Amino acid sequence: MNKAMAITAFKRPEYLTEVLTSLKETSPSDFTLFIGAEPVSADVIKICKSIDFLPTILTINSKVLGVRENPFQTMKRAFDAGFDLVWQLEDDVVLSPDAAALVDAFAKFDRRDEYLCLNLYNPSSWGDEETVYASKGFNALSLAITRSQWDKFFIPNYHSDKRGWDWSMIGLLQRTHLTNLTPALSRSHHIGRAGGTHYRPDQHDHMYVNNPWKQDKSISEFKFKP
């Protein structure tokens, strides 16, 4: 399976640096990295151009696309280039050391296309490091999406809710039998406390600071229990 990553980058170089450091520590193999950078920060673009641990295709947008369209266009470029799976990530979401191992396990799971996608973030983490289960929840804090899922679920529904693409996918889950695959213990964590689009620092702290996520360097033996 040909695998790509799709990262969006805006104007917070300090967060982007943390995200890329965490990504490198997952030891991703056989991924090509697609980046959609908004044309607003020379420091962010410099960081993107300096990436040397994965093959990287950088697109500097001709105008600011925003939090809905930049992820869509970046993922679309990866699928249009022929990749079978795209791992989506934003510039203020850090990863657990075994996050790439989880994505690889998802790629090998023979029933993966029965689900909307793999959601690496779990706001209700309960501590089991190995279990991956079916959930009706959805968030955009790192996803893995196959070509089949992209064509069947994301393309027809991504722009259906004006509030945002996460609301579009939440609505799809609510009105259908579909579920997500998600780890019992979150494999991503939101660090975008300041300078973002959606949250004030106090809102961010309330929603994210105390949510458990896997931080030790052990690699789990993932067990899919949908």
Regions found by a protein language model. Name each.
Residues 1-89, 93-226:
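Peripheral/terminal regions associated with large enzymatic or DNA-binding modules
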